[in-house]
Curated annotation (Swiss-Prot):
It is found in: Secreted. GO terms for molecular function: sodium channel inhibitor activity; toxin activity. GO terms for cellular component: extracellular region. Belongs to the long (4 C-C) scorpion toxin superfamily. Sodium channel inhibitor family. Alpha subfamily. Keywords: Amidation, Disulfide bond, Ion channel impairing toxin, Neurotoxin, Secreted, Signal, Toxin, Voltage-gated sodium channel impairing toxin. SMART domains: Knot1. It comes from the Eukaryota. This is Toxin To10. The modification Proline amide is found at P81. SUPFAM superfamilies: Scorpion toxin-like (SSF57095). Residues 21-80 form the LCN-type CS-alpha/beta domain. Residues 1-19 form the signal peptide. Expressed by the venom gland.
């Protein structure tokens, strides 16, 4: 099989696919505290176009599965309210 044909077919199969990521959603560089409320986090995550979410009990913060690739998630560092 010709390698260029193989590459063309692989490119067509992956065209239009969205990559998704998991993480703590943020607003103003601060994650959302949840108080152990899974329903709140699931709703919050779905509003941000994620597949689902839950309250991660260790950090008591909402964690989302399947966020769009362009969604902001918590990185390293401190929360800076008001900063986008």
């Amino acid at each position: 099989m010709n390698y260029s044909t193989l590459i063309a077919v692989a490119s067509l199969l992956t065209a239009g696919t969205e990559s998704k990521k998991d993480g703590y959603p943020v607003e103003g560089s601060c994650a959302f505290p949840c108080g152990y409320d899974n329903a709140y986090c699931d709703k919050l995550c779905k509003e941000r176009k994620a597949d689902s979410g839950y309250c991660y009990w260790v950090n008591i913060l909402c964690y989302c599965y399947g966020l769009p690739d362009n969604a902001a998630i918590k990185g390293y560092g401190r929360c800076k309210p008001g900063k986008k």
